[in-house]
């Protein structure tokens, strides 16, 4: 019967499960909020530079 047959599915057939199991985190781990705050700070500095920097 079909219900007794165990299928591996598309992911294991394509090797995707093995790929995601071997994934390593490289580089510094940053909090997502910190990345947003840094982006906002850089945007503010750019806008202030446009205002105060002599053309």
Curated annotation (Swiss-Prot):
Whether Membrane counts among this entry's keywords is: yes
Q: Which GO terms describe its biological process?
A: protein transport
The principal localisation class reads: membrane
Q: Where in the cell is it found?
A: Cell membrane
Give TM segment ranges: 32-51
InterPro entries in the record: Preprot_translocase_SecG, SecG/Sec61-beta/Sbh
Which stretches of this protein does UniProt put in the Cytoplasmic compartment? Answer: 1-31
Task: State the membrane topology.
Answer: Single-pass membrane protein
Its keywords, alphabetically, are: Cell membrane, Membrane, Protein transport, Translocation, Transmembrane, Transmembrane helix, Transport
Q: What is any Pfam family matched here? A: Sec61_beta
- Relate the protein's function as given in its record: Involved in protein export. The function of the beta subunit is unknown, but it may be involved in stabilization of the trimeric complex.
Entry similarity comment: Belongs to the SEC61-beta family.
Assembly and interactions? Component of the protein translocase complex. Heterotrimer consisting of alpha (SecY), beta (SecG) and gamma (SecE) subunits. Can form oligomers of the heterotrimer.
Q: What is this protein called?
A: Preprotein translocase subunit SecG
Native organism: Thermoplasma volcanium (strain ATCC 51530 / DSM 4299 / JCM 9571 / NBRC 15438 / GSS1)
Q: What is the lineage of its organism?
A: Archaea, Methanobacteriati, Thermoplasmatota, Thermoplasmata, Thermoplasmatales
The encoding gene: secG
């Amino acid at each position: 019967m079909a219900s007794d047959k165990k299928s591996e599915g598309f992911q294991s057939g394509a090797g995707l499960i093995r790929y995601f199991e071997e994934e390593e985190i490289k580089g510094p781990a940053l909090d997502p909020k910190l990345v947003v705050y840094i982006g906002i700070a850089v945007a503010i500095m750019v806008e202030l530079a446009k205002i105060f920097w002599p053309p």
